[in-house]
Regions:
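Histidine-/acidic-rich catalytic cores in large beta-rich domains
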Residues: 16-418
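Sec-dependent N-terminal signal peptides
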Residues: 3-15
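Cellulosome-associated attachment modules in secreted, modular CAZymes
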Residues: 416-473
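Short, functionally important structural connectors and interaction interfaces within domains
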Residues: 4-7, 94, 162, 265, ...
Length: 473
């Protein structure tokens, strides 16, 4: 097992006693470095563990209960390059071994941004899906806004890592509508089909550039999250200023159609929010979202449980905000009045403190009701309470400029006994761990969280007894 790092992170920050006591997982990204390091850090800015990577991150890593991480990364030569480009996904053990690795960077698919680990061990993957200009025209698309003569659409693939098989897949191409060619199968009145996406909505990439040159990005899906209670998926589209909910209970056949699954709607949108002008039930004044990221459900049992929360990058006057809102859930579907847009008309909670970032950004509710917020371009993470008071913060610093796409904070008991009791992180519990813990307690040093075996917030003889019992089996 790797050596346990108890080092002060190069950071600026402060701590309030009301901050949630947890472990923050993050991977700084740098345009100057092709490799990267993932850190697991406590509230005192001490590294508890690190993982090293040969390639930089596409988004944030995910910590699993066995101590492994799922890490989406950037491949050197992607087949389509735009913001958030990735191409690779790997599972890395606590010890740093690569347990499996897959790349989705070919003439059909290019992974980008986020992934989502599922309870069954599978992984949901966001990909661009290549379509020729002619294929787009044949579906009713009127213009292609780039010189590449292609349109990279959107798909979600469910990977079964043990076999390498794609066991479920959703393609937006199966769920489009257009009102320009009545001879095509997807012809319809846009406002009568909020469950479908107007194929002529928005531009397809650009002909300019920046360092990545022209691209053919249409939807720019930048986040994905899964709700195991509902068996539903939510995704976020930066360019369309909307979030969408899909039914994951569908079979492989149902997901490509318009019926089936728990919702009875197949792979069509169950719900969408943020920009009703996209489906003809509003105008620019009705738009709430602008280039948003980090859509996710607040877990059941947390304050706001069942609501959705996101980071709205350009909320007002080029400043950002975190929004929490309650979707109008109705069984396995979502209520909507005929001719009107999906509700709600506004949010339930908003944080508009001194935050702004033009790219990525994160927002996650914590068990105690606080919210963890990532300001990407300054590599800054803050924790605020429900009143908007800032309780904890840090900024990652180093020899080069860093970003942090997003990060999450995990409870101290999330890893079970993986950290607890292993005082020297040598991969085994033995008498040496007892000696180290006893000496630290005698010295009044509680800096190593592995010593708090009963998670009562203190380290004393009870923790030594628990450690002895663990060693004796």
């Amino acid at each position: 097992m790797n050596q346990l790092f108890i080092l002060i992170l190069s950071s600026l920050g402060f701590i309030n006693a009301q901050a949630y006591d947890g472990y923050t997982l993050f991977t700084p990204m740098s345009v100057l470095d092709s490799n990267a390091t993932t850190y697991l850090m406590n509230n005192d800015y001490e590294f508890l563990h690190t993982w090293t990577h040969d390639q930089g991150p596409a988004s944030m890593p995910y910590l699993l209960t066995d101590g492994s991480i799922i890490y989406p990364y950037r491949v050197p030569f992607p087949t389509m390059s735009a913001g958030g480009v990735g191409g690779g996904i790997q599972k890395q053990s606590w010890d740093g071994d690569i347990l499996w690795e897959y790349e989705f960077s070919n003439e059909q698919y290019q992974h980008h941004h986020d992934v989502q680990p599922l309870p069954n061990g599978n992984i949901l993957i966001i990909v661009w899906e290549k379509k020729t200009a002619q294929e787009a025209y044949d579906m009713g698309r009127e213009t292609i806004n780039n010189p590449l003569n292609v349109m990279w659409s959107t798909a979600i693939l469910e990977l079964e890592p043990e076999s390498g098989n794609i066991v479920w897949e959703w393609h937006i191409w199966d769920h489009t509508v257009q009102d320009v060619n009545s001879e095509l199968s997807n012809f319809g009145i846009i406002s009568e089909h909020p469950e479908l996406f107007d194929i002529n909505c928005g531009s397809v990439g650009n002909d300019a550039g920046g360092p990545q040159g022209a691209n053919a990005d249409w939807m720019h899906i930048n986040a994905i999250h899964y709700n195991s209670i509902l068996d539903q998926i939510v995704i976020s589209s930066r360019t369309q200023n909307e979030i969408f909910i899909l039914d994951h209970s569908t079979s492989s056949e149902e997901v490509s159609g318009h019926s089936g699954g728990n919702s009875g709607m197949g792979g069509d949108f169950l719900y969408r929010w943020g920009n009703p002008e996209n489906y003809g039930r509003g105008d620019e004044s009705d738009r709430i979202l602008s280039s948003q990221h980090s859509i996710n459900w607040i877990p059941a049992g947390y304050p706001g449980g069942g609501n959705l929360i996101l980071f709205n990058n350009f909320h007002e006057d080029n400043t950002s905000a975190v929004l929490e809102f309650s979707p109008p859930i109705d069984g396995n579907n979502y209520a909507i009045i005929e001719g009107e847009s999906f509700g709600p008309e506004t949010w339930e909670w908003i944080y508009t403190g001194d935050i702004t970032t033009p790219m990525q950004g994160g927002a996650f509710r914590l068990p105690n009701g606080n919210t963890l917020i990532t300001q990407t371009h300054t590599a800054t993470v803050i924790e605020v309470d429900s009143e908007g008071n800032e309780l904890w913060s840090f900024t990652h610093e180093g020899e080069s400029s860093y970003w942090i796409a997003r990060c999450e904070k995990y409870s101290p008991d999330y890893l079970g006994n993986l950290l607890l009791g292993d005082m020297n992180s040598d991969g085994s519990l033995n008498v040496l761990d007892i000696v180290i813990l006893a000496n630290l307690i005698l010295a009044g040093d509680t800096s190593n969280p592995a010593g708090d075996l009963n998670q009562d917030g203190s380290q004393n003889i009870l923790d030594i007894v628990l450690l002895v019992n663990l060693i004796l089996g």
